């Protein structure tokens, strides 16, 4: 019997891994939201994963199936409570998530990240720097005010690169 599992993938490889798994005829579920992004010369709707770094796969809990998934480009590991034993996700949770996305409601993916919140940079060239969240540009991009060397610098950062202090 097939079960749903959470597949952890490389940063910003959610859609790559999803497409590769679909080529292998593995049933996947990549919850994503659309957001209108604006560049200097154009606007475009862009899809962003609801859970950055993760997607769901529906496979048999047999070693061959697990190895096939893990050999997919961008895949890192299946989440597990015990090493070597991936933890299944109940079908009801997947169904609820699908219903929530199909409802068309606006979802706040990072409710803990509000304007004025103190944040710390988790990765990238500014790793370890602390600042204040000034503005939310869209679901995933925030303007952070960081004080470095006596100066205040505004930096746009992806939400998965920062955390609330």
Protein language model regions, located:
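Ferredoxin-like alpha/beta domains used as RNA- or RNAP-binding modules
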Residues: 1-165
